[in-house]
Amino acid sequence: MSHLESMVLCREAQVSTLQSLFGERHHFSFPSIFIYGHTASGKTYVTQTLLKTLELPHAFVNCVECFTSRLLLEQILNKLSHLNSSDAGCSTEMTCETFNDFVQLFKQVTSAEHLKDQTVYIVLDKAEYLRDMEANLLPGLLRLQELTDRNVTVIFLSEIIWEKFRPNTGCFEPFVLYFPDYSIGNLQKILSHDHPPEYSADFYAAYINILLGVFYTVCRDLKELRHLAVLNFPKYCEPVVKGEAGERDTRKLWRNIEPHLKKAMQTVYLREISSSQWEKLQKDNTDPGQLKGLSAYTHMELPYYSKFILIAAYLASYNPARTDKRFFLKHHGKIKKTNFLKKHEKTSNHLLGPKPFPLDRLLAILYSIVDSRVAPTANIFSQITSLVTLQLLTIVGHEDQLNGPKYKCTVSLDFIRAIARMVNFDIIKYLYDFL
């Protein structure tokens, strides 16, 4: 256990819970476990490390790689069949057309002597992609232990909550385990663990402390922070290498690295340039804004529905109001663009600038573009207020007017396209100027 804790830092409670769920090798474990948490919260790493360290038979499948249920089921079967084969290259690839075929083939694979008397684990990473496959797949995997009468546990790893998975018809409920975000103390401990051997642990820990002081408010992603730590460490060491400062001259080292980290917030975090381009920038002492190919917008972390509110506001600002029926109603009939054109509308709406729109139109568009129904709660209205505070929306006229406030969207086309990409929304299809 101590060896496992040294490999998996700051996840002792989750490791302990999983070990208690797994139990002894020959005991029947929980049929299905649903593990969720934000990106880079350690879900995949902890699960894989635990299964490998305990040497438990398992098949790990990334659902992103399997765009059909057939590919997914075949990959599970083939990985399990390789566990039986002494030489993985000699085993034949298995095929199955339906979930019923999968159940029968799974029984055959797990009847081998090596797998018969112990729990077999199937780990499905990026499990949210299962929702786009056949309706019977998720309920079937949740009840796989019952359907096959085998000692099997299916582990789902996802970034979204279980309530977004649960079918309307009902299903077997898995054991739900939450991986919270790493605290700043956790990140300090994990990142300090990666210190280069040529420098002392205290020196690298001081650097990580500075790095988190700058980036923690805008980025909690462990992978991003680890990337930033590796990328910016040579600049932090520069005064020490040149003999201008010692390892304990924290103030001098901070003054040297501070402008460098501020530039890093504007470029590398957005992945608008590669690491090699970033290093070249620092050698040439070039302003990041001068690099060809960079966009002008700045990065913001917005809540999920705030992104859709901003998209709806942009559509309301740049589309004529009477085109809403065309874009957001399913049965609008065939309408040609030329039927809408008047003399003053032949100019692009993007050249004329954003038009004001009422709140009810914004909400109507929002409900049309969001997949799941969004109730008009105080949370939605507070997010609109936040967007106004961030100056992404502006209020037109007086706030106390009787017929309700009107708004304008102030963001650029490049900015809104970047926001739309984050939520997989093709905004160009809904813009009147691009018909």
Curated annotation (Swiss-Prot):
Q: Where in the cell is it found?
A: Nucleus; Chromosome
- Per UniProt, ATP binds at 37-44
Asked if the keyword Translocase belongs to this entry, the reply reads no
Q: What is its main location?
A: nucleus
Gene Ontology molecular functions:
ATP binding
**Entry GO CC:** chromatin; cytosol; nuclear origin of replication recognition complex; nucleoplasm
- Per the record's keyword annotation, is Ubl conjugation included, yes or no? yes
What PTMs does it carry? Answer: Multi-mono-ubiquitinated by OBI1; ubiquitination is important for efficient DNA replication origin site activation. Ubiquitination levels are low in mitotic and early G1-phAse cells and are induced in late G1-/early S-phase, peaking in S-phase and decrease toward the end of the cell cycle.
Swiss-Prot/TrEMBL keywords: ATP-binding, Chromosome, DNA replication, Nucleotide-binding, Nucleus, Ubl conjugation
Listed under GO biological process in this entry are: DNA replication; DNA replication initiation; regulation of DNA replication
Q: Which Pfam families match?
A: AAA_16, ORC5_C, ORC5_lid
- What superkingdom heads the lineage? Eukaryota
Q: Which Gene3D superfamilies match?
A: P-loop containing nucleotide triphosphate hydrolases (3.40.50.300)
Q: How does it assemble?
A: Component of ORC, a complex composed of at least 6 subunits: ORC1, ORC2, ORC3, ORC4, ORC5 and ORC6. ORC is regulated in a cell-cycle dependent manner. It is sequentially assembled at the exit from anaphase of mitosis and disassembled as cells enter S phase.
Task: Name the protein family.
Answer: Belongs to the ORC5 family.
Q: What does this protein do?
A: Component of the origin recognition complex (ORC) that binds origins of replication. DNA-binding is ATP-dependent. The specific DNA sequences that define origins of replication have not been identified yet. ORC is required to assemble the pre-replication complex necessary to initiate DNA replication.
What is the protein's name according to its record?
A: Origin recognition complex subunit 5
Q: Which gene encodes it?
A: Orc5
